[in-house]
């Protein structure tokens, strides 16, 4: 089996795993453990690019989780105005996605600011991570539009994004894990060839 097939199967399995768990706390913990593994791999093998990408992803995940899971951002009660709550929640997640896109677009400059390592280079994967957050941003824009149509205009049957929102998030997390694991596999494979 080729590496590409293994990675594709891993990503699909992770999406299915996340959907079955359907618990943000457990998924967050699992995601952080994957990021920690990747960070440790990068640190042990002196690969600052992997370390920095893992740290950036962890920073974004912890920031988002801290805002929503700890109650800093109120997810609303039964009798709240869902238009306002949804706009705040999806709007804040859109802002986090925009921040993440900028973080990964300027990843090299940020990495060089914090480290003087000569190994900090543009990797083949630097052009991919920000696209995951662009995709997440598009989902958040669609969620904002749907929230406005449903709660401001009374289109209460319009719930496609709302019903599948977590699945999109799980897929993006799984793709992120897949990209990181691919980076690790290629580093190991390239090291064996040299």
Enumerate the language-model features and the residues they cover:
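Membrane-interfacial loop-to-transmembrane alpha-helix junctions, especially the N-terminal start
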Residues: 1-5, 46-57, 129-132
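N-terminal membrane topogenic signal
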Residues: 1-8, 166-168
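Juxtamembrane "helix-exit" motif on the non-cytosolic side of transmembrane helices
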Residues: 15-21, 66-79, 145-157
